[in-house]
């Protein structure tokens, strides 16, 4: 455990994570200073009076006088103020690094462009099914520091690339990169390999690395080694097996579960289940309770969630598809009897949308593109695309056209922040309109 006594600590970024950092230091007899570029950041009213605060900008004077800077994942390490501090030899960490220095129980660590919240939650459910006292959080749910507890027997953390950039003490019992596709390119000017390099930090000092056999970018730089266990659709130690119209989860040739016993559906969710099972096995959880958890887990909201089935039409909310890879995962192997009415749009974060084109070739696809990058998305297949300003306009346009056997899918391939507070608000709006129009 690290000793912070007498240290001049500056925390950048408030919100729930920032407050958890403040509480962490106060509990150790250190009063940090806090700054946030927002004038009235969330959590400002909960900050103890003794804590000095600076809002509306970064305070370079405070930063250059600090012994330790705890940076929110929301601020890029390339920011000139942080670069200057790093050049001056000032240590810069994040909340996950603070957590890793203190945690006494094993950690399962999960990252990836898509599927990480589902897999994190699923491994947590597997641990609970085994009667293990588990703490689940990080980039999902509770900030990691709020999970620190002497009673905890296992931690399951979802970690973003931004969190991993400031973490060096992670020693996971099992770690995975589920997949690597373009995301956050606005934060990674050197492209996909720079983004991948941040993700790869999760494997440093990991006991077992769970890699995706279908995605070479998830492999450690030096290639797979004896620490690696793999999962994949048709390849890998954990894979899918198709026999006589049935699909099974299979581990090293042994069939362990028929997917019809699972509440989750879709090929991307079956591979998520394989990854979760590989992590649970590596963490020493009993296989039987892990499989039981797979049969009861219903999935997370806004992730390929069926919000309405009416008159033979399925309305599916996949608002969490905030990047191209996530929408690809939803479309890959998708079975629709009639026409797919696909809603795309929002803020594409400088991504290349062209990988989606191959899924949009059929006669039974109609595109409804909205938001900041709607025109770019409509250009993928202009002859079947319509462009509107908002998602609501798009849904009112498509509603009279749907027939029994059709599917209406919101899988936007974009962030929501151009028109919504977050992807949850976008998904809730879709669900509300589906119930009104369907």
UniProtKB/Swiss-Prot annotation:
Entry EC no(s): 6.3.2.9
Nucleotide-binding recorded as keyword: yes
Biochemical pathway: Cell wall biogenesis; peptidoglycan biosynthesis
One term under GO cellular component: cytoplasm
A Pfam cross-reference name: MurD-like_N
Single GO molecular function: ATP binding
Leading EC class: ligase
InterPro entries on file: Mur-like_cat_sf, Mur_ligase_C, Mur_ligase_C_dom_sf, Mur_ligase_cen, MurD
Catalysed reactions, as listed in the record: UDP-N-acetyl-alpha-D-muramoyl-L-alanine + D-glutamate + ATP = UDP-N-acetyl-alpha-D-muramoyl-L-alanyl-D-glutamate + ADP + phosphate + H(+)
Cited SUPFAM superfamilies: MurCD N-terminal domain (SSF51984), MurD-like peptide ligases, catalytic domain (SSF53623), MurD-like peptide ligases, peptide-binding domain (SSF53244)
Residues where ATP binds: 112-118
Keyword annotations: ATP-binding, Cell cycle, Cell division, Cell shape, Cell wall biogenesis/degradation, Cytoplasm, Ligase, Nucleotide-binding, Peptidoglycan synthesis
Predominant subcellular localization, coarse grouping: cytoplasm
Origin superkingdom: Bacteria
Biological process annotations from GO: cell division; cell wall organization; peptidoglycan biosynthetic process; regulation of cell shape
Subcellular location: Cytoplasm
The protein's role, per its UniProt record: Cell wall formation. Catalyzes the addition of glutamate to the nucleotide precursor UDP-N-acetylmuramoyl-L-alanine (UMA).
Protein family per UniProt: Belongs to the MurCDEF family.
Name used for this protein in its record: UDP-N-acetylmuramoylalanine--D-glutamate ligase
Record organism: Shigella boydii serotype 4 (strain Sb227)
Lineage: Bacteria, Pseudomonadati, Pseudomonadota, Gammaproteobacteria, Enterobacterales
Gene from which the chain derives: murD
């Amino acid at each position: 455990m690290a000793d912070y006594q007498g240290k001049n600590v500056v925390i950048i970024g408030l919100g729930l994570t920032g407050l958890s950092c403040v509480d962490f230091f106060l509990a150790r007899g250190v009063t940090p200073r806090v700054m946030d570029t927002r004038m009235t950041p969330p959590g400002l009213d909960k900050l103890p009076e003794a804590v000095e605060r600076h809002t509306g900008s970064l305070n370079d004077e405070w930063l250059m006088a600090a012994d330790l800077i705890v940076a929110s994942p929301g601020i890029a390490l390339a920011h000139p103020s942080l670069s200057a501090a790093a050049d001056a030899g000032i240590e810069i960490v994040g909340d996950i690094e603070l957590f890793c220095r203190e945690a006494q129980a094993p950690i399962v660590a999960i990252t990836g462009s898509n599927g990480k919240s589902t897999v994190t939650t699923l491994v947590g459910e597997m641990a609970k099914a085994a009667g293990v006292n588990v703490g689940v959080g990080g980039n999902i749910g509770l900030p990691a520091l709020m999970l620190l507890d002497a009673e905890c027997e296992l931690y399951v953390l979802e970690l973003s690339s931004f969190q991993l950039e400031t973490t060096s003490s992670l020693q996971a019992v099992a770690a995975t990169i589920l997949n690597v596709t373009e995301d956050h390119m606005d934060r990674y000017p050197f492209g996909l390999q720079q983004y991948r390099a941040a993700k790869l930090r999760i494997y440093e000092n990991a006991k077992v690395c769970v890699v995706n056999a279908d995605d070479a970018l998830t492999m450690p730089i030096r290639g797979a080694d004896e620490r690696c266990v793999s999962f994949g659709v048709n390849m890998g130690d954990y894979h899918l097996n198709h026999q006589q119209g049935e699909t099974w989860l299979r581990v090293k040739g042994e069939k362990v579960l028929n997917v019809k016993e699972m509440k989750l559906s879709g090929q991307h969710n079956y591979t998520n289940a394989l990854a979760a099972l590989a992590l649970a096995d590596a963490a020493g959880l009993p296989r039987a309770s892990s499989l039981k958890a797979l049969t009861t887990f219903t999935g997370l909201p806004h992730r390929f969630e069926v919000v309405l089935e009416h008159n033979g039409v399925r309305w599916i909310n996949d608002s969490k598809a905030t990047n191209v890879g996530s929408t690809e995962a939803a479309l890959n192997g998708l079975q629709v009897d009639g026409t797919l009415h696909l809603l795309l749009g929002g803020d594409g974060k400088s991504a290349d949308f062209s990988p989606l084109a191959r899924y949009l070739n059929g006669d039974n696809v109609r595109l409804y593109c909205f938001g900041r990058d709607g025109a770019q998305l409509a250009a993928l297949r202009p002859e079947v695309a319509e462009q509107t300003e908002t998602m609501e306009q798009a849904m009112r346009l498509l509603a009279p056209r749907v027939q029994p056997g059709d599917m209406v899918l919101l899988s936007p391939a974009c962030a929501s922040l151009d028109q919504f507070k977050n992807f949850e608000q976008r998904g809730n709006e879709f669900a509300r309109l589906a119930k009104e129009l369907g």
